[in-house]
UniProtKB/Swiss-Prot annotation:
It is found in: Cell membrane. Keywords: Cell membrane, Disulfide bond, G-protein coupled receptor, Glycoprotein, Membrane, Olfaction, Receptor, Sensory transduction, Transducer, Transmembrane, Transmembrane helix. The chain crosses the membrane at residues 39-62, 71-92, 114-133, 153-171, 209-232, 250-272, 286-305. The gene is OR1S2. Glycans are attached at N18. It is a multi-pass membrane protein. Odorant receptor. Residues 1-38, 93-113, 172-208, 273-285 are extracellular. The keyword Protease does not apply. This is Olfactory receptor 1S2. The keyword Cell membrane applies. It comes from Homo sapiens (Human). Its main location: membrane.
Length: 325
C-alpha cells in the first residue's frame, strides 16, 4: 500500500510539475444530514461485520473440509476473499469519517482506494464467469470433471483473474494520475470510485472514458456470455435428468451462483455503463452500495442456505468450535 502511494506521488509530480493541483478530496458520503450519520454508522458497521464473518466462515469451512477441496468450492473461497477485500477497501474509511466528523481523504489514498476498488470488482466479475464454466463442466460433462477441472487448473484460472484485474486497474490508474483536478475536490460518493473522479477532473477525459467503456465492456461481456451459454447448456442437461432429487441438487448449486451473478451484473452495469445524465447521483450511490456492500454480504447467506454441502461444512465447523469450548 505504501509502495503504491509513493509511486503515485512520484508519477503525479512528473506529470503535473509546475501546475496547481489539489492534495485531498472531500467524500460527501451517503447523506449530508447530521441526524443520519449515527444510523449510517450502525448500519454499515453491522453489514461490514456480517460480511467479514460470513465470508470468513466460508473460507475456513472450505479450508478445513477436505471433501470441499474441489475447484467449485475453491472458487467460492476465492470469491469470499475478494468480497471481504472489496468491502474492507471502502466501508472502514467511511466509518472513520463518520466517527471523526471528517470527510477528507488524501490524493494518494483516494487513488489507491480507487485502484483496489477496480481490482476487486473485476476479480469478482471474472470469478463469477469462471464458476459458471466450472458448473457447466460438472453438470454437462460429469465424467470428465475430475480430469479437466483439476486443482492446479482451478488455481491457474484464479491467478489469471487476479493478474488481469491488476493490469486493468493499473491502466485506469496511470491514465487518471495524468489528469488535473484544479479547485474541484468534492466527491458526491462514499468512496473514491473511477466514474465520479473522471467527472471531477478539469482535464479532457475523453481517452479515460473511452478506455473505461471499451475495457469495462470487454470485462463484462466475456464472463456474462460465458455465464449465459453455460446456464443454457446446464438447464438443458438438468431438464433431461429423470431424478427429481438430481434436478433439485443441480438447480440449488447453480441457483446460488446465478443469484449472485444477476445482482452483481445488474448493479455494475447500471452504475458504470448508463449515462449519469439519465439518473440522479443518488442512484449511482445506491448501485455502488449494492455491488460493494450488499452483494458481498449476501454471498455467504445465498451459498450456505441453498447448498447442502456448504451447510454441512458450516455445521461441522460450528459444532467443532462449540465442543472445544
Amino acid at each position: 500500500m505504501k509502495t503504491l502511494c509513493s509511486f503515485l506521488q512520484i508519477s503525479r509530480n512528473m506529470h503535473q510539475e509546475n501546475q496547481t493541483t489539489i492534495t485531498e478530496f472531500i467524500l460527501l458520503g451517503l447523506s449530508n444530514q447530521a441526524e443520519h450519520q449515527n444510523l449510517l454508522f450502525v448500519l454499515f458497521l453491522s453489514m461490514y461485520v456480517v460480511t467479514v464473518v460470513g465470508n470468513g466462515l466460508i473460507i475456513v469451512a472450505i479450508s478445513l473440509d477436505i471433501y470441499l477441496h474441489t475447484p467449485m468450492y475453491l472458487f467460492l473461497a476465492y470469491l469470499s476473499f475478494a468480497d471481504i477485500s472489496s468491502i474492507s477497501n471502502s466501508v472502514p474509511k467511511m466509518l472513520v469519517n463518520i466517527q471523526t466528523n471528517s470527510q477528507s481523504i488524501s490524493y494518494e489514498s483516494c487513488i489507491t482506494q480507487m485502484y483496489f476498488s477496480i481490482v476487486f470488482v473485476v476479480t469478482d466479475n471474472l470469478l463469477l464467469g469462471t464458476m459458471a464454466f466450472d458448473h457447466f463442466v460438472a453438470i454437462c460433462h460429469p465424467l470428465n470433471y475430475t480430469t479437466f477441472m483439476r486443482a492446479r487448473f482451478g488455481t491457474l484460472l484464479t491467478v489469471i483473474s487476479w493478474f488481469l484485474s491488476n493490469i486493468i486497474a493499473l491502466t485506469h490508474t496511470l491514465l487518471l494520475i495524468q489528469l488535473l483536478f484544479c479547485d474541484h475536490n468534492t466527491l458526491p460518493h462514499f468512496f473514491c470510485d473511477l466514474a465520479p473522479l473522471l467527472k471531477l477532473s478539469c482535464s479532457d477525459t475523453m481517452i479515460n472514458e473511452l478506455v473505461l467503456f471499451i475495457v469495462g465492456l470487454s470485462v463484462i461481456i466475456f464472463p456474462f456470455v460465458l455465464i449465459f451459454f453455460s446456464y443454457v447448456c446446464i438447464i438443458r442437461a438438468v431438464l433431461g435428468v429423470s431424478s427429481t432429487q438430481g434436478k433439485w441438487k443441480a438447480f440449488s448449486t447453480c441457483g446460488s451462483h446465478l443469484t449472485i451473478a444477476l445482482l452483481f451484473y445488474g448493479t455494475t452495469v447500471g452504475v458504470y455503463f448508463f449515462p449519469s445524465s439519465t439518473h440522479p447521483e443518488d442512484t449511482d450511490k445506491i448501485g455502488a452500495v449494492l455491488f460493494t456492500v450488499v452483494t458481498p454480504m449476501m454471498n455467504p447467506f445465498i451459498y450456505s442456505l441453498r447448498n447442502k454441502d456448504m451447510k454441512g461444512a458450516l455445521r461441522k465447523l460450528i459444532n467443532r468450535k462449540i465442543s472445544s469450548l
